[in-house]
Design a protein with these regions (language model features):
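Short S/T/G/P-rich N-terminal loop/turn motif that feeds into the first structured element of a domain
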Residues: 1-179, 183-204
């Protein structure tokens, strides 16, 4: 799996409208799924669109088709003229445990970080995802970022609501769960935390 992620500013009145137009083209040209979310934290006030692909080849196929679709430009230009682009990253997961949640507009808690040991990132990522899911998360993922934040890694956990995220965070904090992993966490270079609320999605 591969996810392309764009963060940007656009008038609130146009955000969903623009996404609904764009998502039709990504679906038409074969993307796995698309979503739009609003962000709190590191990228506070930004919107983010995430597009799913099977792999890099599939990304190239979809991108070529959209780039050669004249109607795409005609339909999207009015929105692009009001868009201020911030970042673009591809996300490649090392470990991804996220069952389908069709019909749900979930919440994601997301950390960006760096650590020198990629194998340890995967090992600890799997361990932390299990702990979060035991505390109420409905899925989790850890992997690397390629693009604006090249060289960074991402860790995310999914919840059905912001309250469920808060309950899980309080539970793990009260149990001092992460104090048992201080050797790893103290060696992490933290690069940002954000909460993403999914506003619309075509993922199944």
């Amino acid at each position: 799996m591969l996810v392309g992620s764009w963060t940007y500013r656009i008038p609130n009145s146009k955000a969903i409208e623009a996404f609904n137009v764009a998502s039709q083209y990504f679906k038409k040209h074969g993307a796995v799924g698309s979503s739009i979310g609003s962000l709190l934290g590191r990228d506070n006030g930004l919107y983010v669109v995430n597009i799913g692909y099977e792999n890099w080849t599939h990304f190239g196929e979809v991108d070529d088709k959209i780039s050669n679709d004249d109607q795409w430009g005609k339909d999207m230009d009015p929105y692009f003229s009001e868009t201020e682009w911030e970042t673009m990253n591809f996300y490649e997961p090392f470990f991804h445990k996220m069952e389908s949640d069709a019909g749900v507009k979930p919440i994601f808690a997301q950390w960006m970080f760096f650590h020198q040991d990629m194998n340890l990132i995967q090992e600890k990522g799997e361990t932390f995802i299990k702990a979060w899911m035991d505390s109420g998360a409905t899925g989790g993922s850890v992997g690397r970022l390629i693009g604006k934040n090249d060289g960074s890694y991402g860790f995310a956990v999914r919840f059905n609501s912001m309250k469920e995220y808060g309950i899980a965070q309080d539970k793990l904090n009260s149990e001092e769960y992460f104090s048992n992993h201080r050797d790893f966490l103290d060696a992490v270079d933290w690069r940002g935390f954000s909460l993403m609320r999914i506003l619309e999605t075509t993922w199944e």
